A protein has these predicted regions:
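Short, Lys/Arg-rich N-terminal segment immediately upstream of the first membrane anchor
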Residues: 1-7
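Hydrophobic membrane-insertion alpha-helices, especially the h-region
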Residues: 8-28
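Charged, amphipathic alpha-helical segments
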Residues: 17-18, 48-57, 109-116
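A short, compositionally biased
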Residues: 25-34, 66-69
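Tryptophan-anchored aromatic micro-motifs
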Residues: 31-45
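Short, solvent-exposed secondary-structure boundary motifs
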Residues: 42-47, 79, 106-112
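Extracytoplasmic/periplasmic/luminal assembly and interaction segments
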Residues: 45, 50-101
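Non-cytosolic head/periplasmic domains of membrane-anchored proteins
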Residues: 87-187
């Protein structure tokens, strides 16, 4: 009788664990994090701007595909990052940070939306080891509304801009970028 009681308890514990695991992959997890960060320019040792990266929204864990984040990633000094953001996936190749804003209204008063790409976010799941590479035309337009004409530019590891949360110095930022394989070695 004791043995069957233990088996029942083990079955109930196993079922409870299965339910918790199932819920973890079905129910999105709310996030509201603020990270102190720095922005650097790879070819300019004197360029270092302190900023904040605010992340709020819902994190979706996935067993068979990349995890997904649905919410906002706001970078101080980049005005258009306050706009609606497209869903972001945690891919090994990074994911574009795409924001949608109202560009103008047509003759009937309907909103015409445009897209703003800040850059690409490289991160492990749960925003661990996060780095943002900033497309070249964005730093020029930081506080001016960010509405560049045409392409948002590109990025390269020689003279690109990077936003690195949890780094306090240029050396720390370069080490994180090297560890994340975004640059080959400290320039």
């Amino acid at each position: 009788m004791q043995k069957s009681k233990k088996i029942k308890i083990v079955k109930w514990i196993f079922m409870a664990l299965l339910i918790v695991m199932f819920l973890a992959f079905v129910v999105p997890i709310p996030m509201n994090n603020v990270y102190d960060a720095i922005e650097i320019k790879l070819d300019d040792p004197n360029y270092l701007v302190k900023c904040q990266v605010k992340i709020y929204g819902k994190y979706h864990m996935n067993i068979f595909t990349d995890d997904m984040f649905d919410g906002k990633i706001v970078v101080s000094d980049y005005k258009l990052t306050n706009e609606k953001m497209s869903k972001m996936y945690f891919s090994d190749d990074g994911w574009p940070l795409e924001y949608i804003y109202v560009a103008e209204h047509d003759t009937e008063g309907r909103s015409n939306r445009d897209t703003y790409f800040l850059g690409r976010l490289y991160s492990k799941s749960w925003f661990r080891q996060m780095s943002i590479i900033v497309f070249s035309d964005n730093p020029v337009n930081k506080n001016e509304g960010g509405k560049a004409e045409g392409s948002w530019g590109d990025w390269n590891e020689n003279d690109g801009y990077c936003i690195v949360p949890l780094a306090n110095t240029r050396e720390e930022a370069l080490n994180i970028l090297t560890k994340n394989e975004l640059i080959r070695s400290n320039p």
